[in-house]
């Protein structure tokens, strides 16, 4: 609509210029010609103001919401947190401690890692003792990391260690995320979700939902949702 009005304004400007030309050529013919000249000049000024306003409006409408009519987008500025990509770093296995804890050699130093966003049944808890499916979860993690030719750790966007000094990370064995594999097999639950350390939360919840549907391991028990 703006484009049509702009075109009409340009046509009006052209007509006004022609009228001014006619008035100038007849200005010597009397008072009527002078009034005609004044009228034509006023029309031209008014038309130029309208055309200028419409042109500005057209330019603004083309860039609404950061997208112009050609389809290209203006760069969007994001915070450092929202654009930060996770990356994997190499490590070597020292030993698997239990289902959700491993000890690795990381950057030349031994470090214990707690798997992010998951919780496996206990095997060494001073009060809970050995919980059902705890040994199975420990054996699963041990097999994955011991058989892997390449171990990698992937920190999330938030804090990297817990109050015990353990690294908080996603652990990969030959490219497969151990955290997700445990959840998919029904040997771990999605737990301890704290932003911004939750980049892979939806992946894990999807795997957990599938494990529940298939009633695998901890989800085969009647009290699976009791917080065990």
Curated annotation (Swiss-Prot):
Binds 1 Ca(2+) ion per subunit. SMART domains: SNc. The active site is at 114, 122, 166. GO terms for cellular component: extracellular region. Residues 1-23 form the signal peptide. Keywords: Calcium, Endonuclease, Hydrolase, Metal-binding, Nuclease, Secreted, Signal, Zymogen. It catalyses: Endonucleolytic cleavage to nucleoside 3'-phosphates and 3'-phosphooligonucleotide end-products. Its cofactor is Ca(2+). GO terms for molecular function: endonuclease activity, active with either ribo- or deoxyribonucleic acids and producing 3'-phosphomonoesters; metal ion binding; nucleic acid binding. It is found in: Secreted. Transmembrane segments: none annotated. Residues 24-60 form a propeptide. Its EC number is 3.1.31.1. The keyword Aminoacyl-tRNA synthetase does not apply. Ca(2+) binds at residues 100, 119-120. It is an enzyme of class 3 (hydrolase). SUPFAM superfamilies: Staphylococcal nuclease (SSF50199). PANTHER family: EBNA2 BINDING PROTEIN P100, SERINE_THREONINE-PROTEIN KINASE 31. Belongs to the thermonuclease family. Enzyme that catalyzes the hydrolysis of both DNA and RNA at the 5' position of the phosphodiester bond. This is Thermonuclease.
């Amino acid at each position: 609509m703006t484009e049509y009005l702009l075109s009409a304004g340009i046509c009006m400007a052209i007509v006004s210029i022609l009228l001014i030309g006619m008035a100038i050529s007849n200005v010597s013919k009397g008072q009527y010609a002078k009034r005609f000249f004044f009228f034509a000049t006023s029309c031209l000024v008014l038309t130029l103001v309208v055309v200028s306003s419409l042109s500005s409006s057209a330019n603004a409408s083309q860039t609404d919401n950061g997208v112009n009519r050609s389809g290209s987008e203006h760069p969007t500025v994001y915070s450092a947190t929202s654009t930060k990509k996770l990356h994997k770093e190499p490590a070597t296995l020292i030993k698997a401690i239990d289902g959700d804890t491993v000890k690795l050699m990381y950057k030349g130093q031994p470090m214990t890692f707690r798997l992010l966003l998951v919780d496996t049944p206990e095997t060494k808890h001073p009060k809970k003792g050995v919980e059902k499916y705890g040994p199975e979860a420990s054996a699963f993690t041990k097999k994955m990391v011991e058989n892997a030719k390449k171990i990698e750790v992937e920190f999330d966007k938030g804090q990297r260690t817990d109050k015990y000094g353990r690294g908080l990370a996603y652990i990969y064995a030959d490219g497969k995320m151990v955290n997700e594999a445990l959840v998919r097999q029904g040997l771990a639950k999605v737990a301890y979700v704290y932003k911004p350390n939750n980049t892979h939360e939806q992946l894990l919840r999807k795997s957990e939902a599938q494990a529940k549907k298939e009633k695998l391991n901890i989800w085969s028990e009647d009290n699976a949702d009791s917080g065990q």
